[in-house]
Every structure is written in C-alpha cells, then in structure tokens.
C-alpha cells in the first residue's frame, strides 16, 4: 500500500566458519555499523522534513559508543519526541515505523542462534535445518519485501515488536523474517508428507509442487500480508506448544453444581491454559440444586478462575457463557457485570455472556406479548429449535410449568441496558444457526457459539467444537494505478490473486490443524471428526476505500456480494479437491446435507451469483466429499489488523484516527487511506496542514469538518466512520454476504448517545429486529457506543480495549 524509500534489507556479513557449500547468511548477525548507517539515512530523511532529531535529547553516536543498545536508545528517544506529530504527517508515521524496525534488528540474532534459542519443536527445527540453502534464498526474497513491510505504519511496527515476535534470552528478539519463516515452515511441514494438500494449493490443479515450493508459497503470502494467521498461530507456530486452535465450544451438562465445577476443572481450565477462546453452554437440568442461586454461584466460581488465569498469562483467554432467554436466571445474568452488578457475590466482570435467542422471543417482542421463564423442568427446550421449540414452549406455558412471566419488552430492554452498559450480552439467533447447518439438527439443536459469535459448530457427549482460523487481508489484493495530478489513485480488486490466496489459505490452515496439539480428549475427537476451519477477512472497509468508494455505495454492495461468493466458492472447491486427490471426507459426510447436493447458500434462494462453477462444485462434492465440514467464518481481527493497519474484519473503521495515552506520551494510529487521499488532494503543505487541523478540531470526522461544503462525489465523503454509517445498511451488507458464510459473522452494532447522554433502547431493539428479519445468525456481537460529548469509544468498563481477550483469542 506504500512505496519503500529507505530501509536497507537486513543482511549482515559477520560470518563464522561453516561447512563448504552452506549458506553463509545462515550464520550472519546484524552489526552496529550496518544499523547505524540505516539510522543515519532515516535521520536525514526526518531532518529534510523539518524534524531535528538532535533535539530529541539523545547523545551522539560515535566509534566508542556505537553499540546495539545505544542505537536502540537513540531510536526510542526520537520516536517519543516526534510520534505525536504523525497526525499531521503520513510520511513521518512511516519513517518512525522504519525506526522501530531498526530497533527490532538491534535485538535479533543469527538464524542458527535463533533456532537454538527460540524453543522450536525438534521437527520444525529439523525441517528448517535440512533446507539451509533454501532458507537463505527465502530470506533474500524477504529482503525484497521488507522495505515495504517496514513502512506499513508505526502501529504495525510496534505491534510486531511488543507482542508477536518471539522473546529470546537476554532481551533478544526473533526477527520479522524469522517470525514469518517459523510459521511458514510449520505449515509446510504439515504439507510435506501429504500429496493431496500439496496439489490442492494451486487452483489450476496442474502442478504437484514439492515441499520447498509450498514452503515458499506460504512464506511469501505471509510476508506480503496476504494471509494473516490468528494470534495463536503467530505466537506458537513451530514451538513445542503447537496450540493453533482459536475457538472451543463446550457443552456442560451438569446435573448438580458440583458437576459443573468438575467440568471446569477437567475441561475448561485446560482449554484456557491452551490460550483458546471458549464458548460455553451450561445446562439447566432438572436436578440442579434447589437453591435458585446454584447456577450463579457456579458462574461466580468460573469468573474467579478466569481472573486468576489471566492475571498470570502472557496472553489472556476469554470465555462466553451462552444462555437462552427462558432460563430462570436470565434477569440475574443481565445484571451481573459492571455498573449493573449490585451484589459482589454474583458479579462476573471477567465472563462474557450471550443470549441464544429463539425466534419465538422475537415474535413475542414484536407483538408486545409476554415471556415465560422456566427452571430445569424445561431443560429439553435447549434441544429444540424452530416450530418444534415453539410448540413445546407454548405447551409448557399451558401446563403452568413456568416460574415467572415478564413482558417480552422488559426482557429485551434489560438485554439492551446490559449491552450498552457492560458490553454483553451478545445475541445469536438459534433457529438461523440450526436451520442452516449441514446436519439435520432436529431434536439435538446446537446450544452455543464461540467467544466471538462467528463459529457454528455442534458438540455432543464425545466431542467439543474446535475451529482453526485464518484471515485474508483484502487490502493486499487492491492494485492501485497512478491517477491524474490532484486526484487520489483508484484501485482495482484482483479477484484472480484473491482466489489463489483462498486456495493457499485453505491448505495452510488444514496443514497447521493436522499438527496442532489440543488440550482435552473431546477437543481432539471434535477436531478429527469434522475438521472445521474458518477463513475470514480483514480490511473490508479499507479495500473499499482503496477502490474509491465508501461502504454506503452501490459499488460496495457489488463488491461485498462478489467478494464473499469468491471466498466461499474457492475454499469449498479446494476442500473438495483435497478429497478428490485421495483424502477422506470429514466423518459423517454421507449423513450430511452435502451428500445430497446441498450448499449453505441454498437457504437464500434469492441470492445473486457472479461466478460460474457452483453446479460443478455440487456434483464434485457429491462424488468426492468435503475434507472440511465448514470453511468461512467472519471473525473480528482487532489484534492482527494492527499488524496490517487495515480495518478490522468486515467492520467499518471506528474513527479516522486511533489514539491512546501511554507512559511515554500519545500513541496514534492513522487511517492511511484518508491521509493518502488528503496528500493527493492538497499537495500544498500549508493548505494540507490547514485541512488536517480542521479535521483534528472536528474529531477526525470528515462529515463534521466539512459538512455540506463537500460535493456528494468528493473523495473525502467516503470516509464516514462506524458511528456515522447507516446501521441498517451495514446489516444489509451482512445479509447479502450471509449465503456464503457457512459459520457466522461477528456483527457489531454502533450507536451514538443522544444529546442528553441517553442511548435509546428502541434504536438498538430496531437493529436487533432488523438483523432477525434478515435471517442473520449473529444479531449482535458488541453494541459499541459513542458518547455524545466525545469521539472516544466506550463500552461500559474497558471491554473495548484492543487487548480484550475476545480480540486476542480469535485474531
């Protein structure tokens, strides 16, 4: 997305003795002199733009003080001195990013030392060592893309440094190239002995690549940030841990509180220690303790365990408990977080909650009807959905089995009050989830999703749901051409390259899944049985902006439909191709709807199609099967999107600038597409500065800064933020892509306080009803609120932070 200007590719020629013919660079380490030259080059570039680096307070570097530590310290002082000014200077933002990458390089070690210090598994280390010369070739290719990568942005560089690069002994770091190499090597190792995986990596099916070709393919896709792995893979790929699964769905069927506590000890805690995000259903069995607070006490125990675990974990985990709205404790659950929790004994601030919403509740709400709560005598309702659920629910009402009755609107408004005050509950629609599943779920309905509401997966006595994720960076597939002077460049989306990457990503995540360690036996069973994967996207809004249109445009609607059709078609073709090449379909395929020619999109008969190939795919699936039971999931990507500096997942940008105060000053992330557009429109520095200052005074809202002064087709009008976007239109986009998303999508709602500081519950209720009528599986992930008096996003306590466990667990 940006051109490189200065960073010299890392290659240092300090060699030690090595065997004849081996790649010398394998033993090479960075040198202070090399990095000092890079630093001087960048300092000169900063001075040319008016930033006097000598004023940062750093001592001058000379022959006697030229150490790695001194270089790193000088870089830190320069960054802290000028980072607040990036809001007015995109090039400064990129130059400071390059400085961070030099600081990273002051802490790196040679490839040989990295293999010894990183804690790689024996198998991954051997895979790399057997290919020393080829690895050196890969690092040369990395040197060609590293200048561009190092200029993605300051936020990206700092995220690599602080979180994703492996920490070695004595304060050393793995390099960015080693980071990508580790992930690619582990995935290639999963392909090395699987000819079907290797052949399926190319869409044309005419090539049978060797392990090195696949290794290179994975490596370059990662370096170019086309494929962005989830956080578990980035942290643990190739290590002894091998914890690659992102999502676990557990169904706890306890007859007593002690049964739930046993399950916590035997299954939930091991999964938490594997750093996976958890979606949990807790049964409302007839034999729960007579004390009506039994479930709440169990939840409190679980909440305390989550808090204790995260307090000592380098990577926090998160857990979401799914409850149906007829549950006897529903009103208590809606008052157990944040400012709504009046009783410390039942406060559960570390636990997320979600409502597994039956259609009948939404119908009762719309009709202004009543809603009945039940105890464990109605536990079997959890196994039913659709008409079966409605008939049984109404029968129980007629038999007076209920323990309390409320106006349905009271329950809905309690839900909304909790959502806007504390961040939860999330909302998923039970009927839409089960109706569109590839198995007939009559009498055995699915009861929960995952932590982030985008995974649909069955559980039973023998297995829990497991899903392995990855995402595609859509901005990486936008090819931009030079525009006329004074106009921003307009990009074109490369569907061919995107579909190639879809095939690579499908094999990539399957390869990692085949090597993954899982924390409990039921997870291993679930993983081996269904091989569920979720391939999603990040940068949807950014890709729209780079193509010259906003989310509310006709072009965005067309792009949305075509993009996700391409994603679904290609991933399913690849999964089918793996079976055609000799691998067995997922267990239970012959009993699935797929075996009869069904596809997920058949639930939306009015869909529009852009691509040929669906009819042939149906026939091939019937003939050969599918290796994976599900393939497309649109997860939030709050953490990994900071590496690519694109918009999160399918979501619009929160604001055109992100800012937080730290101990070293203000850290800022820019909307690079907006800054590039402003630079093109206003080449005069003084005029451009005036425009940026105007935006700053209006909280970086182009609508607030310019209002009606901008013509409707002006390039800046497309930069509306999430809170300025038409929420019904965002839901329409979700509905249009829904046929091609066989898992689900983390649908977030964005609302703004009224001038009196209130959030209108009727507004949120209308959006939930709209999502329900569109047939979405996820009605509401987060409900994010912007204060009327501020542009900062808040969510009750601090659940909107970018280190939120819900963000880290998935992506």
From Swiss-Prot:
Alphabetical list of SUPFAM superfamilies matching this protein: PFL-like glycyl radical enzymes
Site (Important for hydrogen atom transfer): 247, 467
Disulfide bonds: 247-467
Superkingdom as given in the UniProt entry: Viruses
Interacts with thioredoxin/glutaredoxin, annotated site positions: 807, 810
Active-site residues from the entry: 450, 452, 454
Keyword list, A-Z: ATP-binding, Disulfide bond, DNA replication, Early protein, Host-virus interaction, Nucleotide-binding, Oxidoreductase, Viral latency, Viral reactivation from latency
Residues noted as binding substrate in the record, renumbered to the chain: 231, 246-247, 277, 450-454, 636-640
Site feature location: Important for electron transfer: 781-782
Record field: catalytic activity: a 2'-deoxyribonucleoside 5'-diphosphate + [thioredoxin]-disulfide + H2O = a ribonucleoside 5'-diphosphate + [thioredoxin]-dithiol
GO BP terms, alphabetized: deoxyribonucleotide biosynthetic process; DNA replication; release from viral latency
Keyword Chloroplast: no
NCBIfam families, per database record: NrdE_NrdA (TIGR02506)
PANTHER family to which the protein is assigned, alphabetical: RIBONUCLEOSIDE-DIPHOSPHATE REDUCTASE LARGE CHAIN, RIBONUCLEOSIDE-DIPHOSPHATE REDUCTASE LARGE SUBUNIT
Its biological purpose: Ribonucleoside-diphosphate reductase holoenzyme provides the precursors necessary for viral DNA synthesis. Allows virus growth in non-dividing cells, as well as reactivation from latency in infected hosts. Catalyzes the biosynthesis of deoxyribonucleotides from the corresponding ribonucleotides.
Subunit structure: Heterotetramer composed of a homodimer of the large subunit (R1) and a homodimer of the small subunit (R2). Larger multisubunit protein complex are also active, composed of (R1)n(R2)n.
HAMAP family in alphabetical order: HSV_RIR1 (MF_04026)
Family to which this protein belongs: Belongs to the ribonucleoside diphosphate reductase large chain family.
Protein name in UniProt: Ribonucleoside-diphosphate reductase large subunit
Name of the coding gene: RIR1
């Amino acid at each position: 997305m940006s051109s490189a200007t200065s960073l010299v590719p890392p290659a240092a020629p300090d060699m030690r003795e090595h065997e004849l013919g081996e790649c010398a660079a394998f033993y090479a380490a960075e040198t202070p002199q090399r990095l000092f030259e890079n630093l001087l080059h960048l300092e000169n570039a900063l001075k040319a733009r008016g930033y006097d680096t000598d004023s940062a307070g750093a001592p001058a570097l000379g022959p006697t003080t030229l150490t790695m530590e001194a270089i790193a310290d000088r870089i830190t002082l320069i960054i802290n001195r000028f980072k607040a000014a990036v809001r007015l200077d995109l090039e400064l933002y990129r130059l400071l990013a390059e400085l961070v990458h030099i600081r990273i390089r002051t802490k790196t070690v040679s490839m040989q030392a990295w293999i010894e210090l990183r804690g790689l598994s024996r198998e991954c280390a051997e895979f790399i060592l057997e290919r020393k010369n080829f690895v050196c070739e890969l690092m040369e290719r990395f040197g060609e893309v590293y200048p561009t990568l190092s200029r993605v942005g300051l936020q990206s560089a700092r995220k690599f440094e602080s979180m994703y690069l492996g920490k070695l002994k004595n304060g050393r770091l793995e390099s960015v190239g080693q980071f990508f190499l580790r992930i690619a090597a582990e995935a290639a190792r999963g392909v090395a002995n699987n000819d079907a995986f290797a052949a399926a990596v190319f869409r044309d099916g005419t090539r049978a690549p060797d392990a090195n070709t696949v290794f290179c393919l994975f490596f370059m896709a990662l370096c170019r940030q086309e494929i962005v792995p989830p956080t578990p893979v980035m942290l643990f790929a190739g290590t002894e841990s091998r914890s690659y699964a992102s999502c676990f769905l557990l169904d706890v069927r306890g007859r007593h509180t002690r049964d739930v506590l046993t399950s916590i000890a035997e299954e939930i805690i091991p999964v938490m220690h594997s750093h996976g995000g958890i979606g949990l259903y807790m049964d409302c069995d007839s034999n729960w303790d007579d004390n009506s607070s039994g479930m709440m006490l169990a939840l409190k125990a679980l909440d305390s365990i989550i808090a204790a675990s995260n307090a000592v974990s380098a990577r926090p985990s998160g857990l979401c408990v799914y409850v149906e709205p007829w549950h006897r404790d529903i009103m208590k659950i809606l008052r157990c977080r944040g400012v709504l929790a009046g009783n410390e004994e039942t406060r559960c601030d570390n636990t997320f909650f979600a409502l597994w919403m039956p259609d009948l509740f939404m119908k009762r709400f719309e009709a202004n009807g009543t809603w009945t709560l039940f105890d464990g005598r109605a536990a079997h309702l959890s196994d039913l959905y659709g008409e079966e659920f409605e008939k049984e629910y109404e029968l129980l009402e007629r038999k007076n089995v209920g323990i309390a009755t409320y106006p349905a609107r009271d329950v809905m408004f309690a839900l909304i009050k909790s959502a806007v005050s504390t961040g939860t509950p999330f909302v998923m629609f039970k009927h839409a989830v089960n109706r569109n599943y590839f198995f007939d779920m009559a009498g055995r309905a699915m009861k929960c999703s995952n932590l982030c509401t985008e995974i649909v997966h069955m559980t039973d006595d023998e297995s829990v749901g497991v899903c392995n994720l990855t995402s595609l960076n859509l901005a990486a597939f936008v090819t931009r051409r030079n525009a006329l002077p004074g106009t921003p460049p307009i990009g074109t989306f490369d569907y061919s390259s995107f579909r190639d990457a879809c095939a690579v990503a499908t094999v990539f995540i399957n390869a990692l899944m085949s090597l993954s360690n899982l924390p409990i036996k039921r997870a291993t069973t679930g993983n081996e049985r269904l091989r569920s994967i979720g391939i999603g996207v990040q940068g949807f809004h950014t890709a729209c902006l780079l193509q010259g249109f906003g989310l509310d445009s006709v072009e965005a609607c067309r792009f949305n439909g075509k993009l996700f059709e391409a994603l679904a078609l290609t991933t399913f073709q690849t999964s089918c191709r793996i079976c055609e090449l000799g691998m067995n379909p997922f267990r239970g395929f012959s009993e699935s709807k797929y075996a009869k020619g069904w596809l997920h999109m058949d639930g939306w008969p009015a869909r529009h199609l852009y691509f040929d190939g669906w009819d042939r795919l149906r026939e091939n699936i019937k003939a050969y099967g599918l290796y994976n039971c599900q393939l497309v999931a649109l997860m939030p990507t709050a953490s990994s999107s900071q590496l690519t500096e694109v918009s999160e997942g399918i979501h619009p940008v929160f604001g055109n600038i992100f800012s937080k105060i730290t101990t070293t000053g203000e850290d800022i992330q820019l909307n690079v597409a907006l800054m590039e557009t402003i630079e093109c429109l206003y080449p005069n520095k003084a005029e451009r500065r005036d425009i940026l200052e105007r935006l700053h005074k209006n909280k970086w809202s182009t609508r607030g800064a310019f209002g009606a002064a901008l013509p409707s087709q002006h390039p800046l009008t497309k930069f509306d933020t999430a809170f300025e976007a038409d929420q019904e239109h965002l839901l329409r986009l979700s509905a249009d892509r829904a046929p091609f998303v066989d898992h689900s999508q983390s649908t977030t709602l964005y609302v703004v306080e009224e001038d009196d500081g209130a959030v209108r519950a009727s507004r949120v209720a209308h959006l939930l009803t709209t999502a329900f009528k569109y047939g979405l599986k996820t009605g509401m992930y987060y409900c994010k609120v912007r204060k009327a008096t501020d542009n900062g996003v808040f969510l009750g306590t601090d659940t909107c932070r970018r280190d939120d466990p819900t963000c880290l667990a998935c992506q």
